[in-house]
């Protein structure tokens, strides 16, 4: 992807999610496979992990600009993945809130996380 497209995408993301989605649609080839999206997500997470690892393990300065860039990339892949699966972004957020409310009624705590029972068979 060329710098012009990245700059345009950044500008549009700042305006609205609808406009951002339009640009994302243009940039995502119709035949893009879900595995490419998942690999992209994984790669971007790896870059964030590496940045934080270098900070914690080797005392390097935390590169917040890089982390912001990588989270932007994660957001792009997330939206592309949801679109490819026909999942609405707002529905995904709502379902996540329901899951967490069920898992941690009354709010999260370390103790509740250890004793959680929502995954028992």
Which stretches of residues belong to each language-model region?
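Flexible "arm" and connector segments at domain edges
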Residues: 1-121
């Amino acid at each position: 992807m060329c710098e012009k497209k990245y700059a345009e995408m950044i500008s549009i993301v700042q305006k609205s999610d609808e406009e951002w989605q339009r640009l994302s649609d243009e940039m995502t080839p119709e035949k893009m496979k879900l595995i490419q999206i998942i690999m992209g997500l994984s790669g971007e997470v790896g870059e964030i992990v590496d940045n934080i690892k270098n900070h914690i393990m080797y005392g390097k300065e935390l590169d917040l600009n890089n982390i912001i860039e990588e989270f932007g990339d994660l957001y792009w892949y997330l939206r592309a993945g949801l679109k490819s699966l026909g999942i609405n972004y707002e529905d995904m957020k709502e379902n996540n809130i329901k899951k967490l409310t069920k898992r941690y009624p009354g709010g999260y705590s370390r103790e509740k996380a250890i004793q959680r029972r929502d995954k028992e068979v």
